[in-house]
Amino acid sequence: MADLLPEHPEFLWANPEPKKSYDVVIVGGGGHGLATAYYLAKNHGITNVAVLEKGWLAGGNMARNTTIIRSNYLWDESAGIYEKSLKLWEQLPEELDYDFLFSQRGVLNLAHTLGDVRESIRRVEANKFNGVDAEWLTPEQVKEVCPIINIGDDIRYPVMGATYQPRAGIAKHDHVAWAFARKANEMGVDIIQNCEVTGFLKDGEKVTGVKTTRGTIHAGKVALAGAGHSSVLAELAGFELPIQSHPLQALVSELFEPVHPTVVMSNHIHVYVSQAHKGELVMGAGIDTYNGYGQRGAFHVIEEQMAAAVELFPIFARAHVLRTWGGIVDTTMDALPIISKTPIQNLYVNCGWGTGGFKGTPGAGFTLAHTIANDEAHALNAPFSLERFETGHLIDEHGAAAVAH
C-alpha cells in the first residue's frame, strides 16, 4: 500500500541547519523564492544559496491561490513578462522532471457591458501584436467552449462575449513548489523552514546578512520574496515600498464529475472558477477592501461572489462549499510587480504581484535571478523598477489585471 502513495514532500529535499554565511539569501520560501533559487543555480551557477521560510515551505500565497495561469495582458511590458512566464510553464514539467499537472485548458475572460466588449477586443488585438494567443468569442462561441455557462439575457450581467486564450490553464500549486524545491536542493541550495527573518545586518547602506529566529546568517546578497509581507520586510531593512496588502478570498466545493472544461473569469462581477483535477470547483472572489495581513476575509465578499457564480452557472446551485480561506495580496498603484534593486546595496525585491503572483512564478524567478546575479535588471523586468514610482513612468494594467486571478 505504501508504494501506491505519493512521496511525502519533505522527502524531496533536505532540511539542513542554516550555515553561517551564503552567497545569496532569499527571504520567502514560496513559489517565487524557490524559482529564484532554481534559476540562480541553473542559469548563473550560483548554488551557495539559502531560501528562508518563516513557516512551512510554500504555505503562504502559494498554497492559497486559485492556480490560474495566463498571459493575455494589455501593455507590452506586462505581456512580455507574463508571456515569458507562460513559455517557461510549458517546458517546466520536463525540465524539473516533475508532473505538476499543468493543464492548458484555456481561459475565458467574460465581457458583460459595452465597455467590457470594447476593452476586451482592444486587448485581443494588443495580444496579437505581442505574439500572445488571443481570440474574441461571441456568446454562442463562449457556450461552445464552456457548455454549462448561462448566456441568456435575463440575468443581471449577461454574457456579451469573451476573450479566449487557448494556451492558458491551471497547475497544481503545491506540486509546483515541490518541483522547484526538489530541483534546487539537487543543485545545492539550502531550503530552511521555520526560520523567520527578524532584521537585517547592514554596513552603512549595504546589506550584509539577516537576523533570524534560528540565528544570524551572513550573506553577500539578499533578495526579498515575501509577497504580502514585503512591506514589513522592507521596513525592517530601512526603506518603504509603495504597496498595500489586502486579504483575497477563495473557496472550494465538494468533488464532482468533470463538468467544467475550461477556466472562466469575470472581472466585472469577480467570479473566477475552474475545476481542479480531483473534481472540486475552485472559485476566487474579489479582494477585501481593507488593508490587512489576515488570511481570512469578510463573509459578504463570498456571499456576493456565490450569488454571481450561480447566475452564470445555474448547475452550481446545489453545490456544497467545503471551505473558504484567504491569502494576502500585495498591490501596487499600477497593478504590476516590482522586481528591482533597492536603495540598500545588494538588497533586491520581488513584490507587488497582487493577484498575478502564481501565474508569474517562473518569470519572476527567472528575472529576479538575473537581477541578483548581474546587479542589473533583465530587459523583461527593467520596466518594473522601484524608481518608476518616483519618475511617474507607471504602466496602468488595471484593465487586464484589476483583481483578476
UniProtKB/Swiss-Prot annotation:
Record PTM Tele-8alpha-FMN histidine, positions in chain: H173
SUPFAM superfamilies in UniProt: FAD-linked reductases, C-terminal domain (SSF54373), FAD/NAD(P)-binding domain (SSF51905)
Top-level taxon in the UniProt lineage: Bacteria
Entry's localization field: Cytoplasm
Cofactor(s), names only, from the UniProt record: FAD; FMN
Positions with a binding annotation for FAD: G31, H32, E53, N61, M62, T66, I68, V197, G354, G357, K359
Manner of cofactor binding, per the entry note: Binds 1 FAD per subunit. Binds 1 FMN covalently.
Coiled-coil zones: none
EC number: 1.5.3.24
GO MF term list: nucleotide binding; sarcosine oxidase activity
Pfam families the record matches: DAO (PF01266)
Alphabetized UniProt keyword annotations: Cytoplasm, FAD, Flavoprotein, FMN, Nucleotide-binding, Oxidoreductase
One cellular component (GO) term of this entry: cytoplasm
Catalytic activity reported: sarcosine + (6S)-5,6,7,8-tetrahydrofolate + O2 = (6R)-5,10-methylene-5,6,7,8-tetrahydrofolate + glycine + H2O2; sarcosine + O2 + H2O = formaldehyde + glycine + H2O2
Gene3D superfamilies in UniProt: D-Amino Acid Oxidase, subunit A, domain 2 (3.30.9.10), FAD/NAD(P)-binding domain (3.50.50.60)
Alphabetical list of InterPro entries matching this protein: FAD-dep_OxRdtase, FAD/NAD-bd_sf, Rhodanese-like_dom, SoxB
Gene Ontology process terms (BP): tetrahydrofolate metabolic process
Protein family per UniProt: Belongs to the SoxB family.
Function field: In the presence of tetrahydrofolate, catalyzes the oxidative demethylation of sarcosine to yield glycine, 5,10-methylenetetrahydrofolate and hydrogen peroxide. In the absence of tetrahydrofolate, catalyzes the oxidative demethylation of sarcosine to yield glycine, formaldehyde and hydrogen peroxide.
Protein known as: Sarcosine oxidase subunit beta
Protein source organism: Arthrobacter sp
